[in-house]
Amino acid sequence: MRAKPSDAKLTGLFLDMLAAEQGAGPNTLDAYRRDLTDFSEFLGRVGHSFADAETQTLRDYLADLDTRGFKSTSVARRLSAMRHLYRFLLNERIRGDDPAAILSGPKRGRGLPKVLSIADVDRMLRRARELSEAEDASPSKRLRALRLYCLLEVLYATGLRVSELVALPRTAAKRDARMIVVRGKGNKERLVPLNEASRQAMADYLAATEAAKSDKKTGVAASKWLFPSFGESGHLTRQHFARDLKELAVASGLQARLVSPHVLRHAFASHLLHNGADLRIVQTLLGHTDISTTQIYTHVVEERLKSLVRDLHPLAEK
């Protein structure tokens, strides 16, 4: 009798398929790996594995997540990982059934994203610019301030995912570039326009990095990345940028918990829609494959339409 493949082996095969056939990126693969590792550890505790777990065991795992205090969004994500895994195992004939097919997830309403006001974003931009222009700052401190200001300007101008932003190549800062090519989820490319402020911020930051290369005290070396670092990836990490952004929020008089790279991406989309942008255009700029993902912002469009009717309809005052 042939031995059952281990959970680790099946996880590896599944992740290889996601990378090869669906173009899943490192962040997506890491998320699946974490979720499936947790699921595997639960199965091990109850004497099962991916290869022999039944539907009731999967239900027990979902109940365990609830007992451990996981939010409904996190439970739904784990369930999605399980469904994808067992569909793969069925297609590969590793299993003859799909125990996750009839599972139902937690009911959850999709919450509206937190949105910073235009005034809040402007406060952060002004503070970041002030820090980048501080004359008494050391060369290394000024370079970090210029980097943060550049990151903020580009993020609010483009609405990039944070993973796309920190991994921009150095070539994105070409002189007079009006558009940048962004490699997004599934390795798909899209063109995103830059405004004058973001282009200038990139030019100033790039000039500072060029000057810093000759200064050994700054530790700046040649790199293909626009925002290089000495870490394994070679570029600034999402976590580092998020931490810097929260510090900037506090320095701008805002609550750190209300600010993140993702919140600024939401601000980009919401502010565009509030000012009349078409939902399909915003979908393209955000890199959403499905319009339903972008439709979370329709509350902004609805409020604007109500305002237009209230302010412009000839009988609105009667």
Curated annotation (Swiss-Prot):
> What's this protein's function?
Site-specific tyrosine recombinase, which acts by catalyzing the cutting and rejoining of the recombining DNA molecules. The XerC-XerD complex is essential to convert dimers of the bacterial chromosome into monomers to permit their segregation at cell division. It also contributes to the segregational stability of plasmids.
Which GO molecular function terms does the record list? DNA binding; tyrosine-based site-specific recombinase activity
One biological process term in Gene Ontology: chromosome segregation
Question: What residues does the Core-binding (CB) domain cover?
Answer: 5-90
Q: Which NCBIfam families match?
A: PRK00283.1, recomb_XerD
Tell me which residues this entry annotates as catalytic: R161, K185, H262, R265, H288, Y297
Any idea where the Tyr recombinase domain is? 111-310
UniProt record similarity statement: Belongs to the 'phage' integrase family. XerD subfamily.
Q: Which Pfam families match?
A: Phage_int_SAM_1, Phage_integrase
GO (cellular component) term, any one: cytoplasm
Q: Which UniProt keywords apply?
A: Cell cycle, Cell division, Chromosome partition, Cytoplasm, DNA integration, DNA recombination, DNA-binding
Localization, UniProt: Cytoplasm
Major location category of this protein: cytoplasm
Q: How does it assemble?
A: Forms a cyclic heterotetrameric complex composed of two molecules of XerC and two molecules of XerD.
Listed SUPFAM superfamilies: DNA breaking-rejoining enzymes
| Stated name of the protein | Tyrosine recombinase XerD
